[in-house]
Regions:
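Formylglycine-dependent sulfatase
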Residues: 1-194
Length: 194
């Protein structure tokens, strides 16, 4: 799939809606983030059924589809355990979803959903959502290859680690300890001096 006029916006829900549908974010009801949805044209936070997502189109053509990670394309008042579920990933063409519905979540104790069911992350001090998603994504691909090796697949991968809260394990943060203590300006000067 290749887009010829795609652009990002400064906020995530609109960009995700455009990426998923191949259409302008306001034309698909996502002129702002899902939590700020209002009853104005282009700002409802609802991707209309008349605007199919890539997953819906590809599933129609025989693909198996899965989404992992951050969704953030459902109005907040519709993300409870009671649904409605038609605006969750499985209602937008994904056969499988594992991730979180909101704009951000803890990377160590995330509020996770598998398809339409809330699930608890493992209670393990070494747990991190990015690693969990990678393991589950690889597992999904292995199952797909085992059960339907000739069937095409589409995996939507949307990690949440770039969003707050910024939580990284010590094995990663330790590599940068002391490198930025002089401040942004000093670092910038060193970079531009190279």
């Amino acid at each position: 799939i290749s887009y010829n006029t795609f652009h990002t916006t400064a906020i995530c829900s609109p960009t995700r809606a455009a990426l998923l549908t191949g259409r302008n974010h306001q034309r698909v009801g996502n002129g702002t983030i899902a939590e700020r949805a209002v009853d104005w044209d282009g700002y409802t936070g609802v991707i209309p059924k008349s605007s199919a997502t890539m997953a819906e189109v590809l599933r129609h053509y025989g693909y198996r589809t899965a989404a992992f990670g951050k969704w953030h394309n459902t109005p907040a008042n519709q993300t409870t355990a009671m649904g409605p579920f038609d605006r969750w990933p499985t209602g937008h063409g994904f056969d499988y979803f594992y991730g979180f519905l909101a704009g951000e979540t803890s990377q160590w104790e995330p509020r996770l959903v598998e398809n339409t069911t809330a699930v608890e992350p493992p209670h393990d001090e070494k747990y991190h959502l990015s690693e969990d998603m990678a393991v589950r994504g690889i597992d999904w691909l292995r199952k797909h290859r085992s059960f339907a090796p000739d069937k095409p697949f589409f995996m939507y991968w949307a990690p949440g680690a770039a969003h707050g809260p910024h939580q990284v394990g010590k094995e990663w943060s330790g590599k940068y300890k002391g490198k930025f203590d002089a401040g942004w300006d000093a670092y910038r000067e060193r970079v531009f001096a190279r």
